[in-house]
Structures are given as C-alpha cells and as structure tokens.
Amino acid sequence: MERSRQVYYIINEYLGRHPSSTEYQVLKHQVEKISKINNFNKETFFFLLKKNKNKFFKDLELSDDLLKKRIDEYFSKQKHAKRLGNLFAIMELQKILISSFTKTIGILTTKVPEYYHSTIKLEYSSMEKIADDILDSYNVVEPSKEVKGRHKVSDLVGHVYKIMEEYLRRHSNSCLCYGSYSLHFLNNKIEYGDIDVLQTNARTFLINIAFLIKFITGRRIVLLKVPFLKNYVIMHDEETNHVMDTFNIREKTMNMIPKIMIDNMYIVDPCIQLLNMIKMLSQIDRLEELQAKFEKLSVRLGTLLEYTRYRYSIPLDSESILEVRAKLDKDKRKITVDFKKYKLNYIKCYFYLDEVELKKFISKNSGLDEYEDFEAVTNSEYAIRNKTMYTYFSNTALMRSENEIHPITINALTSHALLYHVITRKFYDDLLGDLVRSLMIVEKVPVFKIIPRDKKQGRHTIIDIEKDIIFH
C-alpha cells in the first residue's frame, strides 16, 4: 500500500494534478523515469545552457529570465497534455534530454586538450590535370533542363557548424565526417558546405541539438527520418529550411570503417570516399550536373586520387588496367561481373538493381560463406556463397549500346565491390590499382540507354518537440 501511495504521489507531482485511472494504470510502469524527471536539477541545466549560448550563439541576445522561462515551460509541458500519446512523447523526450544532454552537448563547453593542426602534405596539383581529363570523359550527357529542388539553408547552420566541429573532436569514437568538409583538411582549395557525418548515436545527438536550439533561440526544430536512405535523419527549422543531416550506423560498422585522424577528428579514409564518388557518378542526375559542378568536382577527385595513390602505393606507370566482363540480365534486373583475373574470395559478382531481390536471396540462404552489412557507408549488404558475391547496386546503370554496359557503370560496379575489400582490408591491391589506372584512360562514350534504379517504398517519420510528436 505504501508503494502505491508513493507511485501515486510521483505521478501526481509530474502531472501537477490527480491522474485519471487510465493515466495512473499506464504511468505507474514509468514511475522510475518520471521520478528522475521530477528530480532533474533545472538550475544546473540553466547554467549549462548559458555556457553553450556563450560559446556557440555569441551574437544572440538572450536574457537569463527568458532562458529560465523556456526551461520551466518545457518541464511543465506534461501538465497541459490533452492526449496520452502526447504525454508519452513529452516524457520520452524529457528522459532523453536529462539522461544524455550533459555528456553529448554539455561537454562541448569544457576545456579541450590542446592539439596540433595536422595534415597530410601531398602535391595535389599533380593530379589536377588528370582529374580534369577523367571528368571530361564522364561528361557524356546533356545538362538537365529540369530545375532541381535544392534545400534552402537555415540561418541556424552557422551555429550548428561550430557545434559540429567541437563535437567531432570530443566524440571521435562515435562520430566521423566525410565529404567536402573532411577533404578540406587535406586540400584547402576544397570548399565545403554541409558537414557530413556518420554517428552511432545520431538520434540522441539530434534531439539534444534540437533542444539546445529551442532553449537558446526559441525556434522550432523538426527531425525527419527519410525512408529511401539507410538510417538517414534530416533536421529542419520551422520553415523546412535545412539545418543539418546525419546517418546513423552501428558501432560495429564504425569500428570497421578505415579512417584517418586530422586535427583531433576522424575522417572516413579518402580511398573509401573516392570509391563512393566513382560509384555515384553512374547516377544519371549526377552526370547531368557534372558540367555545372566541374571545377569543384575536379579538385575533389584530384585530391582523392592523389591520397589513394600515395596511401595505397599505386604505381601509375604500370600497364595493368581493369579487366572485367559485365553482362546485364534485363528481365531479372541483375548485372553479372566476372572478376576472374583478380585473386579475390569470389570469381564473379551479381549486382542486383532491386534491393528486395538481394534480401530475398540472403533470407533463403543461411549457409553463406561471408556476410557484411556496412549500412549507409556502402548502401548495401554483401554476401558470398560458392565463389560468388551478391550485392545491391543503388544507382542507375548506363548502357553504351543495347547489350553493352557503359564504362562509367563498369567503374562504378567495380568501386562498389572494392568498398567491401577496402573496408575488410583484404584482396584489394590489384583491383584497386587497375581501377585507378583505368580511370586515366580517356574514352568518351555516349550513353545509349539508362536502366533506372529501384524505387523505394516507405513514408517519412518525424520528431517534433514543439508538437509533442515522436515517430522514430
């Protein structure tokens, strides 16, 4: 009886009123969580937010009274919830905030150990002309006349960049970056826009960032999970302007990804980024944008090539080039590539153009020789059985004739296979060298036909702190 009274008191304190019988029956199972929220030290939290404000939002006017008011209003929000679903959303978000904010975002205001600026000194200009020639050979489709929808950038982005730069240094075991921001550390000629990151705790991180922005600025932030990309979450402001995005990956994947440390932060090994860039260029809309982005892409490609040549000891004067045979099965939407020349742990690879077909194969075959899922890093699983690799190719496949696959797609397919080898650190030497040297053989081939990529099904799910919605 004493325990029941104690539970009732805790729920009553949380709601600021007597719970209904339904509320009591549901909330009594959450009483430990509720008790922690009731006992949360809002005064300490206030001082922590002030430190974040002074470090990351210096130019913003914010009085202590207004900040305290916003904190009090949010931690009283459950008292005004009309529906049980909203009450649960409030409680879940409050629980995440009180249990993770300090170690996720709060720590960014503490003194960081001194570090020395470091970079890899390579002569990237030597690859600039080669990169120009490679991209010129890829410039084989007309620019699209369709106006592409590009996300509008929120005015909050500058603040978030400062937070992300600090976060990458403090949380290097759970977060690493890739893309133009990471490559800027290798070659300062590379301009960057977004800071692209992979994380093992993306959901918790983004919720805490959303709360920080809410308390400091009063702005509404929405987190949108996109079904078409693996564990991809976008952050929008109240006008759907883009704030940031991130991919979530498992800790196992994070540990496997080859990475290098520059300025106390980890970046995805540029060889992995090179292979993903070559792979992505098989996507028709990327080729349609090539002319408009030529200079920017050329600097990036030249940097990635020079790093890969140096780090993986690739002799460019060797006469050995890519020797693979590729064949499309139009009805089954499957491409078979023969890798017989190379000493791999398989002889050929089936690239499914529909992900569901790969998943069917994996589910029907429990006795696989090898299996890996690198999630968003490769956007596919890899399975090996009886000297054959099975994987999924997520981009458009280009044809040079009715029955011949275009060299751009052959390079992309090879890159996709190589991602498996470079990440697992085995059997990549000869194939990687041949691919890099083959890129330098300029052959401008028109695109005869485009095999579309598969269409993903699903719906967007959201987390909206302001509206008390949590659907992912």
From Swiss-Prot:
<dbReference type="GO" id="GO:1990817">
    <property type="term" value="F:poly(A) RNA polymerase activity"/>
</dbReference>
<keyword id="KW-0804">Transcription</keyword>
<dbReference type="InterPro" id="IPR024231">
    <property type="entry name" value="PolyA_pol_nucTrfase_Poxvir"/>
</dbReference>
<dbReference type="InterPro" id="IPR004976">
    <property type="entry name" value="PolyA_pol_cat_Poxvir"/>
</dbReference>
<comment type="function">
    <text>Polymerase that creates the 3'-poly(A) tail of mRNA's.</text>
</comment>
<dbReference type="Pfam" id="PF12630">
    <property type="entry name" value="Pox_polyA_pol_N"/>
</dbReference>
<keyword id="KW-0507">mRNA processing</keyword>
<dbReference type="GO" id="GO:0005524">
    <property type="term" value="F:ATP binding"/>
</dbReference>
<dbReference type="InterPro" id="IPR038419">
    <property type="entry name" value="PolyA_pol_nucTrfase_sf_Poxvir"/>
</dbReference>
<dbReference type="InterPro" id="IPR037265">
    <property type="entry name" value="PolyA_pol_cat_sf"/>
</dbReference>
<dbReference type="InterPro" id="IPR024397">
    <property type="entry name" value="Poxvirus_polyA_pol_cat_C"/>
</dbReference>
<protein>
    <recommendedName>
        <fullName>Poly(A) polymerase catalytic subunit</fullName>
        <ecNumber>2.7.7.19</ecNumber>
    </recommendedName>
</protein>
<comment type="similarity">
    <text>Belongs to the poxviridae poly(A) polymerase catalytic subunit family.</text>
</comment>
<dbReference type="InterPro" id="IPR038337">
    <property type="entry name" value="Poxvirus_polyA_pol_cat_N_sf"/>
</dbReference>
<feature type="active site">
    <location>
        <position position="196"/>
    </location>
</feature>
<dbReference type="Pfam" id="PF03296">
    <property type="entry name" value="Pox_polyA_pol"/>
</dbReference>
<keyword id="KW-0808">Transferase</keyword>
<feature type="active site">
    <location>
        <position position="194"/>
    </location>
</feature>
<comment type="subunit">
    <text>Heterodimer of a large (catalytic) subunit and a small (regulatory) subunit.</text>
</comment>
<keyword id="KW-0067">ATP-binding</keyword>
<dbReference type="Pfam" id="PF12629">
    <property type="entry name" value="Pox_polyA_pol_C"/>
</dbReference>
<dbReference type="InterPro" id="IPR024398">
    <property type="entry name" value="Poxvirus_polyA_pol_cat_N"/>
</dbReference>
<keyword id="KW-0547">Nucleotide-binding</keyword>
<dbReference type="GO" id="GO:0006397">
    <property type="term" value="P:mRNA processing"/>
</dbReference>
